Amino acid sequence: MSLENLERINKLHVEAPDQEEIKNLILAASERLSDSQKTGLSYSSRFDLAYNASHGLALAALRAAGYRSDQRYIVFQCLQHTSGLAKGRIRIFSTCHERRNLAEYEGHYEKDEQLLAELIDAGNALLTEFQV
């Protein structure tokens, strides 16, 4: 579904890009991605850092396109329109969003180092799109 169609059904809101907001989202995400690779931290801390970094970058991409969403998962779904990432990498974000929700809201905790590594890799790929 296009960004315009998502706006039409009230999943997105048109909002002019704010360069300061976008810059700060990218900066915070960059720091979180870096911290997520510190092996001295627990798995859950590293996952939270990588997930929140990726969400911040996806939100920055959406904001740069002139939209905002009130729903976390939508920013990941919009990456097919707001980034050059391959669909496989975008699916990693969706999988991690589902895992995050299971852990946060249902107490289902599953440690998966491979998924975390893929999340960090996908987050770094998204971060690279913002670097000139």
Predicted features by range, described:
Residues 1-132:
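Terminal alpha-helical segments
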